[in-house]
Amino acid sequence: GGKDSTVLLTLVWLALRKIKRDTITPFQLRRSIYVMCNDTMVENPIIATYVDEVLAQIETKAREEDLPIFVRKTEPKLEDSFWVNVIGKGYPVPNTAFRWCTDKMKIKPTARFIIEQVDECGEAIILIGTRKAESATRARSIKKHEVYGKRLTNHTILRNTYVYAPIKELMLEEV
């Protein structure tokens, strides 16, 4: 992920370490925490290899520290993949006016994973590394979905799924 996702993961990691250190029987460490990565399958091979190495390091370090952090990589279904849509179906290359790839290659695969978790655990909480200061569009989106006085908001589509944006108020200089 980018800098915001990295900051979010770091904060979660530090919080889990603190819980483990300060609590005799840390019941908070019983639930699995998944670091999600969307593999669009069109990334430069050098970048893809680097991402795989970073994800492996996250998983290894989590096991060393006995933290319930697990890495999961999602991929689009074949019919939603970039090349099937561009070459096979004749879609234009994604642009600002027609961003079909975000839904097919990132949102749908992640949603499938979340639905599996909800089916297994009853609910899911998504921690998302978005900030109001990223852009006016991002600020509007956050404002539209936040509920004053509530940390968790209902996911707009997925049942029993909640969203938490703990770094939404941070400025660029703070990340």
Model features per residue range: what roles?
Residues G2:
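Conserved G/P- and acidic residue-centered "switch" motifs that form tight phosphate/ATP-binding loops
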Residues S5-V175:
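Nucleotide-activated chemistry modules centered on ATP-dependent adenylation/adenylyltransferase
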